[in-house]
Design a protein with these regions (language model features):
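Short S/T/G/P-rich N-terminal loop/turn motif that feeds into the first structured element of a domain
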Residues: 1-52, 57-68, 92-98
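C-terminal structural segments of small proteins and small subunits
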Residues: 64-66, 71-91
């Protein structure tokens, strides 16, 4: 079943975040499809950050494999230092029953 990595946060250090993007994009490329990269998300409930990212993976296992890989774990600290008010999750897609 298709799965999605959904992240929402505020970028507090653009230069550091660009460094993270440059290093993380090749890691996430294998089987992933970037669906959303919005720098001006409009929050309607709660206190969401301004940036939202949605990445599609073929399965939840594939998404977890990328997130938990040594390569991604080596750069995740850069993202965490560049953002605040962050949250992220990996969720299964939904198939409407027929």
């Amino acid at each position: 079943m298709t799965a999605y990595l959904i992240a929402n946060y505020d970028v507090v250090d653009r230069d550091l975040y660009r460094s993270y993007q440059k290093q993380s994009m090749p890691i996430m490329a294998g089987g992933a499809k970037l669906l959303v990269l919005d720098h001006a998300s409009v929050g309607k409930e709660g206190t969401p950050g301004a940036q939202t990212v949605v990445i599609e993976y073929p399965t939840k296992e594939a998404a977890l494999a990328v997130y938990e890989s040594d390569e991604y774990q080596a750069v995740i600290g850069i993202r965490l230092s560049a953002i605040s008010n962050g949250r992220g999750m990996i969720v299964d897609g939904f198939v409407m029953p027929s």
